[in-house]
Structure formats: C-alpha cells, structure tokens
C-alpha cells in the first residue's frame, strides 16, 4: 500500500556553510579551524566546495523547480564575527540578507543553523567549547543574529553537538584531532548544551518571532546479541555517549541517574571528571520546555558487543568497504558483520533505526513538541552519465523511500513529524571524505560548478507534489 505524508509536510534539502559556500577567505570572512586542519592533514580543502556563496540563486531556482520547499542553511559565524566576537563584518551580514531574500522569493523556507562544525579559529585555538568563554561569545553571536535577521522564522542553535565532541576528542577526525579523551567529549557536549539552553532562553525572553530548536544526530544503538548482558550494556553505554546525554540535557534539564551512572563508569575506566555547576543545571532546566522542535539527523544504526580491551578506532575515509574498526575501552565494540546492508563507508543502512529513534523521543521526552528529520541521505560514488547529463541514483531513491516509509509509520503511531530534509540539496564537500562522497539531488561538476538534476531529483519532485511515497 502506498503511504502518504501530510499536506503541510516540508520536503527540504540540507546544506551547511562550510560544506557548500566556498569563499573561505572572501569579503572579510575569518578563518575557522578546518582551514588549517585540512591544509595540514588532507588532500582537499573546502575551496570552492559548491560555490554556494555565488551560486545560491541557481540552487534556489532548482529548489523551487523541483518542489523543495525548505532549505537548511547555516550561517558561518566567522563571516559575521571574523574572530568570533567584537567587530562585525558588514559584507557577511549583507550576504545572508541577500540569501534569505532569495529563499523567500523562491518560496523555499530557510531553516537556519547558527553553528555547523565551524567555530572561528581564534576561539577554537583557545579551547573551543571546552572554554566557557566560548559559551558567552556564542550567545552574543546568537543574539546578534536574532536581532539582525527577523526574516528568519526557524532557528537552530547547533548542528550535531554529539558528533562535534566525538569527532574532535574521540575519533580524532575533526580538529584538533584528539583521540579517546572521554572527559573532553562529555565536557564539550555539556558546555554546548548550556550554550544552546542560554540561546533558547534569550530567544524566548526577547520575544523574537519564529521558532527555535536544536539538531541532534541520533544513531540508534542495538545489542548484537540481545540475550547477552554484556552486549546490552555496551549498547546502553554507546547510546549515552551519542544520544541520551544530550537528549537528557535538552528535554529533562538535567542528566538522569542512569545517564550519569554510565558517564561515571566510562570516566572511571578511562580517567577524567566532569565540571558541571548548579548554575549549569539551572540554565538547562530553564530551557527544557522552550524548544519548539527537535531536528533529528539519522543515517545509520550500530550493533554493539561487550569489549574489555583498549580503545581503537579506524575511520573509513576512502569508501573502501570493510575498512572500519570501532572499539572503546569501558564501553564496547561495534560489530560490522551483521545481516544489514551498508554503504561503501561502512554506514549501516537500517530504516527501522529511524523509526525506533523517533518513537524513543516521543516516549522518553514527551515535551519534544515536534520533530523535523533534518538530515538523511545516501553517500555514494555517483557515476555521471555524460550523454544524459544525469546520474541514475536508484540506490539513493530506494534509501530515501525506505526512510520516508518509516517516518509515515511513526506519524501514524503518534509522532509529530513535520518535515524531511534530504542531505544534501546539491553535492557538497564532505568533512572527512572530500569530494568523492556525494549526497545531492543535484550533481555538481566541481570543475565548472554546473548543476545537473539526478534521477532522485525528479523522484523527489513527484513526491513533494503528490505526498505519496512511491
């Protein structure tokens, strides 16, 4: 039976400033840590990425033509405040006014994120969000944007607080490239949640029009053997690191007893302690019911086994299937040999995990209000067919179809899901995979910056028009 989605459902496309804009040092933009990190460690940079800084009218015209009625955009903090604080860069401000005006001209609603992995380099060098001064600077930046851009009706504070701490201090594939430091992981999570809560409270107290929320990446964690207590415990601990800790902070305004027991166990095995003050808890508590929506980014699930060895993570950056290893001291190890399809980058394709995660939020955090699926999509080595000027990305269509079907199921079962943003609108630069891993509805020739609709774009257009998942 063909499933349908609600009439007012947002069929969106997602982007991020650093992954799409290019123009990394144009018109007064300040540096971010990624600029130096990529130059020193990788064979690619974010220049020119998808040249969205100049090509946004083309991408928004395509959005309108193909039924995309929402777009996730992030403001580059260092385009507004080159040093993260102090002097404002007027050309950066002007750019975003023009961008939002073009969105509205094309009837594409902008959902605007204040921070998408791109803390200004000056602040990043000074400890990023481990330094509590950065919290103050972020809140000042947020307030400036709320005042300056009243044309924005949907704000999110952060994109993926979990993967920021994870990438910077656990896996070590984000600058500053530190591995297995759980104290920094949890402290980063916590401090960013305090920054989020302060910004949300400020938005509500200031009487700004519109809505505000946060985007969390929520990969679902399962025990490899549900009858094995060690596997069950490993899944619980992995869930605390990636999901429960930040969800508790968002919607409980504190950390539940089970969450803190798990955190203390991980820190007792690996070393370190958290600095959480009474004032922090008061800030979290004051904002817990003020979030208008939750953005869920979902790509994959993981299956966990018990593990008592040392930490070792091998990140698959090349797209050679089978190149991943992930085992954490005091937590568990991910089992990749499961009967579930996976991408070339070893990401497990499991739509049921999205359904389970949505319903977990509904059950455990009933003050969630509403949900947008703010990222979901398939990274692929797309093959451009020159004679047809397109890509036959049937695997992507199938992936999105399966995930939309479980979203429809979740809505039937009581979840208030209001929209879906495919990652990504057009092909963009990938943080740890460069330009080979493509996600877009529109193929980007990175040499010429020409855009070509893929087969998935035509499929998505029909979906947006009919609301039927075919």
Swiss-Prot record:
Reactions the enzyme catalyzes: a 6-phospho-beta-D-galactoside + H2O = D-galactose 6-phosphate + an alcohol
Name of protein: 6-phospho-beta-galactosidase
Entry's transmembrane regions: none
Record InterPro entries: 6P-beta-galactosidase (IPR005928), Glyco_hydro_1 (IPR001360), Glyco_hydro_1_AS (IPR018120), Glyco_hydro_1_N_CS (IPR033132), Glycoside_hydrolase_SF (IPR017853)
PROSITE patterns attached to this UniProt entry: GLYCOSYL_HYDROL_F1_1 (PS00572), GLYCOSYL_HYDROL_F1_2 (PS00653)
Gene symbol of the encoding locus: lacG
GO MF annotations, alphabetized: 6-phospho-beta-galactosidase activity; beta-glucosidase activity
Annotated active site: 160, 375
Cross-referenced Gene3D superfamilies: Glycosidases
Keyword Hydrolase among UniProt keywords: yes
